Amino acid sequence: MANLFGRTARLQISSTVPAIGGTVTSWIEVTGLRVSFTVKRTLKPDANSASVEVFNLSATSRAGIKRKGVRVILEAGYQDVGLETVIQGDCRLASHEQSGTEWVTRFELLDGGRVLRYGRASTSYAPGTPVSKAVGDLAGKLGLSGGQLAKQLPSLAAKTLNGIVTHGGVGETLDKLLKPQGYSWSIQDGKLQVLKGDSDSTELIPLISTDSGLIGSPKLLTPDKNEGRSLLSFRSLLNARIRPGCLVAVQSKQFSGQFRVESVTHKGDTHGTDWTSEVEAIL
């Protein structure tokens, strides 16, 4: 825990609204200001969300996020350890309010919000086409490639389509391609993630113990009524490496082992008391 001091955060805001599937070429970087946030991330196909407040942004930076759709990357961490991405998302709502001598900028983010709302798929595949190709093509077209997807697609290479025509929204198309194969999907930091059953995302495994930021004791939650699975709930100092789908190694008196993260809520304030990650993981 010795290195988990000196909290720090950084925002990167795109100078323009990128096209669906396009890349950002110019960023406005914000450092050294007070930032507070609540970020909610899950394995569900609904977009992950964040509420962010930034204090005393310059007039130029405020002007840069007046329009919906600008891309925002929120990073947080510790001075001795470095920064990790807490969320990357599209701005769906922004406001600037002057309170006394301070300007407070508030905005709401949705991870993959624009592509899920406006992205469309229209193509056809012949019988025998690997599912991995169809999913990879869609991800590439819509700018969702990257992350852990390259490691996850090979497991779909042996599965083939009977012949399919895709024409509709992104979520509808992914459901059509993946659900029959027993796979689920979500968007994490602007990248498509696909998982089979209770498999994990193959990312590095964060260690959660009293020496690495665990707060209090983990709790065992009542099994989900629909799936009959127990959940382990725990709270730690902010750790942005804890992402839905990854494994965490928990070490405590009551529970020890590796658990797959189902959801995480990161709360932080560089000048306040909040700086935690609240996690639910399956046993």
Question: Predicted regions span which residues?
Answer:
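Short solvent-exposed strand/turn elements
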Residues: 103-120, 273-283
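A generic structural motif
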Residues: 95, 113, 265-267
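Short beta-strands and strand-coil junctions in structured, solvent-facing domains, enriched
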Residues: 59-62, 80-81, 115, 145, ...
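Short beta-strand-centered interaction patches in the first periplasmic/extracellular domains
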Residues: 93, 102-116, 148-223
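Amphipathic, non-transmembrane alpha-helical segments in extracytoplasmic/periplasmic proteins
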Residues: 50-55, 109, 122-147, 164-188, ...
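Extended Gly/Ser/Thr-rich low-complexity repeat segments
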Residues: 63-71, 117-125, 245-251
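An acidic/polar, Gly/Ser/Thr-rich interaction patch typically located in mid-to-C-terminal regions
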Residues: 37-61, 65, 197-283
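Assembly/oligomerization scaffold segments
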Residues: 1-108
